[in-house]
Regions:
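Alpha-helical segment proximal to the catalytic Tyr-Lys
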Residues: 132, 176-180, 239
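C-terminal substrate-recognition "lid" of short-chain dehydrogenase/reductases
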Residues: 86, 139, 219-248, 253
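Active-site loop-to-helix junction immediately N-terminal to the catalytic Tyr of the SDR YXXXK motif
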Residues: 3, 107, 153-161, 173
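Residue(s) in the substrate-gating loop at a strand-loop-helix junction
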Residues: 147
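Conserved glycine-rich cofactor-binding loop
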Residues: 12, 19-20, 43
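Substrate-binding pocket helix/loop in short-chain dehydrogenase/reductase
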Residues: 103-104, 108-116, 211
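Active-site helix of classical SDR
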Residues: 127, 163, 171
């Protein structure tokens, strides 16, 4: 199989929550195979800086923008800017998300709703905004960053697990809706990676070791280990892959 199938020259990828963590890592990976980029987060300065750095490193076109994924008007503004400056969105990586760690009894309804709004409704908003342009082109990739915790439970994560499980079924549903339009829709389920969101666990030796003990490979994921999966799902190489989930968790959910 030719490695040209993994190249993305002439395509534009939008990564939500792309200014840091796995989002920034995936943005670099996609730029590394030729994709132009749209980086969005809630902070314009972080998004602009990330886009500038990646554009200079990989010699691609990119812009950064502030967008709250829970606000359709802000999401639609990003899509409109991408249409003007980069020819529209070809690849959407729904990565923005948060986690609030509290038990069901301790969880205020406002915290529950905030996680659901950002992790589940936000990606729906982005896909709804980006899909019409993909339909016009007859080609597109929508990728949801779910989690291994969308497949298995973990105490003190009720809205996070619910939202990430929702993304898996949202991907399956939209895969059926958009198949006739040349658009594939899939989900990635990462296990523990050393991201900003996981700092509380990284800084707690007992909690960290508890997680490691459940991973057959025996360690947390290294950031670059997400690269191959995102490139595959974003590229022509995955043209017959839709409505499915790829888990990157060191074997946690195999048990």
């Amino acid at each position: 199989m030719s490695l040209d199938l993994f190249k993305l020259h002439g395509k534009t990828a939008w990564i939500t929550g792309g200014a840091k963590g796995l989002g920034f890592q995936m943005a670099n990976a996609l730029a590394g195979v030729g994709a132009n980029l749209v980086i969005s987060s809630r902070h314009a300065d972080e998004s602009v800086a990330a886009a500038k750095q990646i554009a200079e490193t990989h010699k691609v076109r990119a812009f950064g923008a502030a967008a709250d994924v829970t606000k359709p008007a802000e999401v639609e503004a990003v899509v409109a800017q991408a249409e003007r400056e980069l020819g529209g969105i070809d690849i959407l990586v729904n990565n923005a998300g948060i986690n609030i760690r509290k038990s069901t009894i301790e969880m205020p309804l406002e915290d529950w709703q905030q996680v659901i709004d950002i992790n589940l409704t936000g990606p729906f908003n982005c896909s709804k905004a980006a899909a019409p342009g993909m339909i016009r082109k007859g080609w597109g990739r929508i990728i949801y960053m779910s989690s291994m915790l969308g497949q298995v439970g973990l105490a003190a994560r009720p809205p996070y697990t619910a939202s990430k499980a929702g993304l898996i079924l949202l991907a399956k549903t939209q895969a059926l809706e958009f198949a006739k339009n040349g658009i594939t829709v899939n989900a990635i389920c990462p296990g523990p990676f050393g991201t900003e969101m996981n700092k509380p666990l990284l800084q707690n030796p007992e909690a960290y070791q508890n997680f490691v003990s459940k991973i057959p490979i025996g360690r947390w994921g290294e950031m670059h280990e997400i690269d191959g999966v995102i490139i595959f799902l974003a590229s022509p190489a995955s043209s017959y892959v839709t409505g499915t989930t790829i888990t990157v968790d060191g074997g946690w959910t195999a048990q």
